[in-house]
Amino acid sequence: MHTVFYVSDGTAITAEVFGHAVLSQFPLAFEQITIPFVETLEKARQVRMRIDEQFRQTGVRPILFHTIVDHQVREEVLKAQASSHDFLNTFVSPLEHELGVKAEPRLHRTHGMENRKLYDDRIEAVNFALANDDGITTKEYDEADIILIGVSRCGKTPTSLYLALQFGIRAANYPFIEQDMGVLDLPAALKANRHKLFGLTIAPQRLHEIRNQRRANSRYSSLEQCEQELACVERLFRQEAIRFLDTSSHSVEEISAKILEATGLRRQLY
């Protein structure tokens, strides 16, 4: 098995994201090790020695994905016996030529706090998502960028939090529960903000599996109950012309991207 090292003088998030995207194209398993904040020559030497030791023990050359700004630190890490892939310089040099401007490398620029307003906006969005989770309150819906609606356990909460943390979007979510299913209608707070509504649904069998993990062998988790609730809620979506998405086979990242594409919501953070 190949060992993959993600090394950076910052958080290593960028190296991980790019690396995961590349490795996902291969039907192989990898041992993955992340080493952030390699900011000194001494730390770089330790990383080089660790990579070389891994090679010595396994006999398989490790793969190294790195985003290191400092030239000396980067060169020390690159002495390691590894297949090295530099995401920053791969793109920086061609862009310098295209833009006619020299890059000005700086530590922690990507995921640091250089832009305090963007950071504050993201924290406020996360706080908003938590305060408006699961229909706790509907008083702040006028401040929401989007309101996700659907049955319990269809993916509303993780999607709301991801939209907030990743994009600074104020996402509220509201659940339809069993007691709502008799004559299902939009509550007044949702009607007043119907232009912000976006529905989530899910395959009955998948919902049954998820609910069974939380409350096994209950009416709440029974396949029949899941089928009835979903049929009722999807009927409401169609009657009210509310856009909705089946989350059954999508990750939270994919769900969020599809919502942004469908709604045209502007990504606040990059």
Curated annotation (Swiss-Prot):
HAMAP family: PSRP (MF_01062)
Protein name (database record): Putative phosphoenolpyruvate synthase regulatory protein
Keyword Nucleotide-binding: yes
Superkingdom classification of source: Bacteria
Catalytic reaction annotation: [pyruvate, water dikinase] + ADP = [pyruvate, water dikinase]-phosphate + AMP + H(+); [pyruvate, water dikinase]-phosphate + phosphate + H(+) = [pyruvate, water dikinase] + diphosphate
Organism: Aeromonas hydrophila subsp. hydrophila (strain ATCC 7966 / DSM 30187 / BCRC 13018 / CCUG 14551 / JCM 1027 / KCTC 2358 / NCIMB 9240 / NCTC 8049)
Family as reported in the entry's similarity comment: Belongs to the pyruvate, phosphate/water dikinase regulatory protein family. PSRP subfamily.
One Gene Ontology MF term: protein serine/threonine kinase activity
Enzyme class, broadest EC rank: transferase
KW Kinase (keyword) present: yes
The protein's role, per its UniProt record: Bifunctional serine/threonine kinase and phosphorylase involved in the regulation of the phosphoenolpyruvate synthase (PEPS) by catalyzing its phosphorylation/dephosphorylation.
